[in-house]
Amino acid sequence: MASTIQMFYIARFTLPNVYVYHGRGTIPNTYPNPKGTLDMTKETVLRKPEAMIFDMDGTLFQTETLLLPAYHQLFDTLRAEGHFEGETPPEERMLGSLGMLLEDIWKVVMPEASVAAHRRADELLLQLEIEGLDGGSSQLYPQVKETLKALKEQGVRLFVASNGLEDYVKGVAFAHEIMPLFEGVYSAGQYKTPSKVNLVQILLEKHRIQDAWMVGDRSSDVEAGKMNNQTVIGCAYAGFGRDEELAGSDVLISDFTELLRLYREAE
């Protein structure tokens, strides 16, 4: 596992439902107010996209259903192999670090451990997650598969762009039987991109897409969409915390199925 690959994410954001105004696809936008919180005051008119690009973790996939069991198994193995001593670090430390480079994640989660322990943790995490996917206990968010099918039936081209490793991202899509719905599944692990901005740029250029919605739960998704001049739909339904995470999104949704309504009401 290359140390330069960015780790997958869990959404960390809570906000009330986005209110969708009827007619002409007009919806409240989100902008930081002077206190740094999000304000639902400015309106945006959405255009129907030719494609939607989805983040995987915290957007389509409930990452914690796979990550947290693997996290505890990982530390059991590290202790057994002599790479780590003491209690397993709090889950919150791991969850709060997701989205960083893997090498930086372990510096936060177990700063006292050796570089060898960090690299072994890289290997174990991917291994345990692939095994967990085979075990069938992980979950997509409610109605994700059905919503994706409905969007595809309406002619929307569907893609994934994730900062995770290739085997992990595609493994999630295959395990949950959504892989056939996507025209392309892009990952930092496959393309060795330094940021999601670059990954989305590659996707857009390769498939000659001019108008897309970037759908995701993290600031990197907002950045990837905006830096590539695309609309950003912020996913605020996983409930893990930083208020500023999705600042700059064109729309916030609190349920994945809201995408169908937004698409239907867009111009």
Label each PLM-derived region with a short phrase.
Residues 177-186, 244-263:
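Structural recognition of alpha->loop->beta junctions
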Residues 45-142:
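N-terminal helical cap/lid subdomain that shapes the substrate entry/recognition surface
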Residues 196-222:
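Conserved Lys-Pro-Asp/Glu-containing loop-to-beta segment of HAD-superfamily phosphomonoesterases
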Residues 214-251:
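Acidic, Mg2+-coordinating phosphoryl-transfer loop and its flanking beta/alpha structural elements
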Residues 4-54:
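Non-catalytic pre-domain segments flanking phosphatase-related domains
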Residues 131-160, 170, 197:
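Short, acidic loop-to-helix structural element flanking the phosphoryl-transfer center
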